[in-house]
Amino acid sequence: MPVVVIGRFKADVAMFLGVVQTRAADFEAVAAEAKTQGALHHRFVAGPGEVLIIDEWESAEAFESFFSSQPVIPQIMAESGVEGPPEFSFYSPLASPDVF
């Protein structure tokens, strides 16, 4: 059953956006690899002092395996000034008639 993954990264949002621009090809390559390992949806969102990922994966195990073995993500995190390890939460999607 798919899971929604929320990841919180303490980071300077402007610095992160700069890395998105300078390493766009790396972001695209990581996304392509993620799709082969079970990623269904992905996006970044930001708030004051933090960047979040909102993903949907085939399973929590698929996400954890991908994230722990992906060599480019730690480089991007370091260049983005991420402070400390990210925090991940996993949620089960609920079926309801108002989903869109």
Say what each PLM segment does.
Residues 1-71, 82-100:
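Short S/T/G/P-rich N-terminal loop/turn motif that feeds into the first structured element of a domain
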Residues 74-78:
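Helix-adjacent hinge/juxtasegments
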